[in-house]
């Protein structure tokens, strides 16, 4: 289900409003009407126009590096330019572009407001908007993920410490900052600050994990991490025989092979009765080839505990979540020792 509404396109990039943004806007407008003041509603709308321009700054430079921009999504807590993986060589310039746009808007509005301003309900609109843009640019330059400053910091540090270690440094700063924000948010009962702190924390955590997986599993294929020549069961094996087989080999899931070909898979969670055979309970296996990369393997494992490696119609190996974690631990240690 799509939870966003497309407004228009700029530079070929769709601008979309998330449904929560619309609900938040309705609340802001409602409160403005109740208080006989439209200032905050107008300011809110103009601020998010500024956010769109901020994200377009990132997107414009990113497109120069051949990055595909899916869309810019507006949320109550800000905007997100959803794009393909940013190339390492362009991360510094792409990261700086957004805050630079915000600073330019802020400085221009600040200068203009000294000669001309729009007063609504006694509040100076342009002056207030200029300060918010300067704050937006400054906040995004905080050297912590998922803010732009985190990407800028990583781009600078990666020249000395490597991409993975630099990501972890920026992510840890981001999570530490998020915990401080959460503490202040809870003490002051500030819902917005609490939501922003959660966004920052999980954004930093996600960035760290994604980069860690991409870095340590670079050039790793299914054949490199699979358990080769796995034990298997046959479709005609009784459930009682299967349970004894499972007790002997200590695994929770097994491939089902008939006449040398993989025909299914079965695990402890598939068994509900003692009657019948393996054929009655087996499921369709999720299959990959020996050269399948880790990204595709993880995508296929989203709804299953294991995938089976098949080449030329023959079962070559099995990859379980335990295999993934084991390989990750070993490869992560190799990466750390390399640095």
From Swiss-Prot:
One of its GO terms (molecular function) is metal ion binding. The chain crosses the membrane at residues 10-30, 33-53, 96-116, 125-145, 180-200, 251-271. It is an enzyme of class 3 (hydrolase). Its cofactor is Zn(2+). Binds 1 zinc ion per subunit. It is a multi-pass membrane protein. Keywords: CBS domain, Cell membrane, Hydrolase, Membrane, Metal-binding, Metalloprotease, Protease, Repeat, Transmembrane, Transmembrane helix, Zinc. SMART domains: CBS. One of its GO terms (biological process) is proteolysis. CDD domains: CBS_pair_peptidase_M50, S2P-M50_SpoIVFB_CBS. GO terms for cellular component: plasma membrane. It is found in: Cell membrane. Its EC number is 3.4.24.-. Monomer. Belongs to the peptidase M50B family. This is Zinc metalloprotease MJ0392. It comes from Methanocaldococcus jannaschii (strain ATCC 43067 / DSM 2661 / JAL-1 / JCM 10045 / NBRC 100440).
